[in-house]
Amino acid sequence: TRKNTTRKNTTRKNTTRKKIKITQGLIKREDSLIDPKCVSLKPFQAKFEKQFSKSLVKSNQSFKKKIARQLLQQFAPTRLSPKNDFYNYINYMWLKNLEVSDKQKYIVQFDDFRLVQDRVYQELDQHIMDYIKSNKNRLSTELKNFRTSVVNMNTKENSRKLALKHVDYVNEMCNSNDENKLWQLLGHINSDEMIASSAPFVWSIAPNEKQSTNYCSYIYPHSFSILDINVYFDKSSYANNYKSEFRKHCKKLFDTLLGKGNHNFNPNDVLDVEIELIYTYDCKGVMETKGNYNKVTKNEAMDKYGFNWEELTKALGYKTAPSFFVTSSLEYLNCATKIMKEKWNSEKWKTYWVWIFLRQIARVTRDWEEITYKFHGEFQRGQEKINYSDSVSASLYMSVPFNTFLTNQYLKNHKNPKALLYVKTLCEDLKIVFMRIIKRNKWLSPKTKKYALLKLKNIEFVIGHMAKLREDPLLGYTTNLYDNMKKIHTWRHKRFIELDGKPTIDIPLMDWSAYPVKMAGNQAYVVNASYTPAKNSIFINLGYIQKPFIDMDERGIEYNLANIGFTIGHELSHALDDWGSKYDDKGNLYDWWTPKDKKIFKKMQNEVTSQYTEFAKRDKIIYDAAIGIGENMADISAMAIVDEYLRDFQEKNNTLPAIRSLSYEALYTYYAFQMKQQLATNALAAQLKTNPHALDKYRTNIPLSRSQIFRALFNIKKGDKMWWNNTNTIW
């Protein structure tokens, strides 16, 4: 402590800085070059104090007592403990108190990802409306027209005319004995992204998995309407009820769009055709199938499988048929082609063709979308309410024609360079940690380990948004939604045709087989992160680089590691999981594993599956955990990566042992909390059948049960429910 003294005539004039002002207790240098945004600590007390009662400003005793009570009381019932159920122990109060608005009840999984995505939809729509209000140009007119068409949807009168028009078209095709009409019909359906997945054969342009820098044509099987595939084969009461609901849905569709009693279609035929198609997977006589990549030349298609590639590509709009296509199943190609050629113009198949068009029309029509929702949303997915938010609908539909506009608006308003740099740094450091783990690996052979390290070394991180965006086409949109979607899909289809055999570029995609429709590409405004094997790259969308997934202001390394750090580790792990491990460092399909390593790896997969099955069984949930093996292994591996990163971070900073303990406890607490999720009441069955991600309770407890540090920190012993018989973290 220095004694306070005053010296005469020693006051020096400040000649280098302007006078320091004192305002509201804050010292400010008027000539400061420091951007307040760069300071993580934000002033809050002046505003926060206004929330206090007058008595609290004068006396702090009651507030102290309240805080003490909160700290001492249990935040979960005594039946829950870290030793037995860490997920519910941490999230009990959140799960108990979660409230969602009616407009959010189109969501079936209430978690941070989906709730933030819902908010992003609102933000995107606000950017659209702000631009329309502030500008008078062609773009603002096209935006206004398209948004109006989405909000109003098609009128019933217009849609009924469209339905009858498509009935006439199908009759014209099917009443001909010319088999070329079949391929014209198939090509016509595949030229529209909204309905292509319903066709018996689905054409698509995608990166060639054995030459991933170029596109090629793929022929995929039909995307089946019923999510639980076993229903098509089973005759149980559950399966019969499921099929009955689908038949009712089809009947409602035909009767509503064509008029009850005004058509001769038997809606039951739709299910019969889908059953015929699904049984072709088991047909015999084709032995050439090798995995999901089967190259079929133009001549082979017709000579060996009867598949008229020449006529189909002509109908699609090709001037010359590509020399080959790739398919995932030669059995399906062979047998589904035979059935289709034999029955395509029968009354049963005629109903099926008409159904493909009717379901699209209903989806874009005011009130008729309810038909789609009732089966695909409410019955199949457990959705509590149909989406009736104009902002959500506008953002989803307008992302197809205006992706570049939306991307630029989102970057302009939400890009945080500091956060992007933080994520980039974390990506590179976590990759180093993962590579170190692989170097220490004891069960991989030297050959396989060398390739694994090469693959990790060459992973590309794309953070925030894609570097190149194509110009949005302004196609003279009107206020008719069906016509607008036709215009943009026709434009996109022509561009897809031009890409066949050409170098790959980024294309924003939509999954129209999902309900509600979802974005499936690398749109910057999606709240997600993903690994793409064909590119050996990890894309972290800008929509994900925000609170609560990363906090640059008030949280520490433990918080960010548990959130975005864990996600990065998860995506890194996908490079070596059951799917990613089939591709090399350049993104091409290549078998770089020794037979012995494959055998060990498969054994580990089975052991992981058994743990997820066992943990679910304790809650009386029976499901096939094998569908999520890649995701489950990525979770386990990611936890090991962040564990080691935090250890190194503490070593670097020479952290006190007591603080290290608190640091790890914070990491695991934040991890459990960021995994919190509430399912809609009737959504569980669909999630277990279709979602490759396990329920978040198991995504939390199982990776933690394999962490040696977690086990030691919480003194987990054999007999505790958080105990597992090994702490193997795969790599």
Question: At which residue positions do the language-model features occur?
Answer:
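Short, well-ordered loop/turn elements at secondary-structure boundaries
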Residues: 80-83, 197, 210-213, 523-526, ...
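Arg/Lys-rich, intrinsically disordered low-complexity tails that mediate electrostatic binding
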Residues: 1-30, 50
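Intrinsically disordered, low-complexity linker/terminal regions across diverse proteins
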Residues: 57-60, 270, 276, 295-307, ...
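Short, surface-exposed beta-strand/loop micro-motifs that present aromatic residues
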Residues: 74-78, 204-206, 526-531
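Hydrophobic/aromatic-rich, well-ordered segments within soluble, folded domains that form packed cores
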Residues: 76-96, 235-255, 639-641
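Noncatalytic, helix-rich "gating/capping" subdomain that lines the substrate-entry/channel surface
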Residues: 63, 119-430, 466-469, 481-493
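Short, solvent-exposed loop/turn elements at domain surfaces
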Residues: 94-99, 225-227, 548
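Extracellular/luminal recognition modules and glycoprotein regions
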Residues: 35, 40-118
